[in-house]
Amino acid sequence: TEDWRFRMVTAPKGDFAGVPLNAEGRKIANEWDAAKDQASSDHCKAYGAPAIMREPSRFHITWVDDNTLKIETDAGNQIRLLHFGGAVPPGTKPSLQGYSIASWQLALGGRAGRGGQGQPGGAAQRGGSLKVMTTNLTSGYLRRNGVPYSDKTTVTEYYDLLRESDGEQWLIVKTIVEDPQYLTEPFITSTNLKKEADGSKWKPEPCEVR
């Protein structure tokens, strides 16, 4: 897959190719201590919302209710909640997955279903993207080898569902990470996820420091 040496294995310290780090971000990445992370009780720094969709993981996506979509990951055993409408509730504490607000970006002629105002009962139909804005994050890693993001980070995602002529379904996730503390410009990735026939390979595992 693309970015194999970052997604499938832990790259060496100082290998942050492709990430637009500023001087402060590079300094922190170059000081990464794998042994210190291993000894820490927090092994989930690379599993936050800015990075989790790039993990070599399976994703289980279900509706909690008409206005809340849940994404579960087997890598790191994480849960993301995507809230349709509204704003971040006052007093919400920052967290690894932050607070995500979702909306349908409909193509011409599209129709909103669940998450659409006044139209519960079905997913978005006939084209368009799911847009997700995530804030209220704690700091963590963009990559497992200590490439940092700060608690000032915001994440914008676009989810597009594609169906091949042979019936295979793909979820394309475009992720835009913006961090005024450690990045000189947005860090943009695109991840292709293929739908499996069933959940037989689903195997949640705890966060790892590799």
Indicate residue ranges for each PLM-predicted region.
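PEST-like low-complexity, intrinsically disordered acidic/proline/serine-rich tracts
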Residues: T1-R210
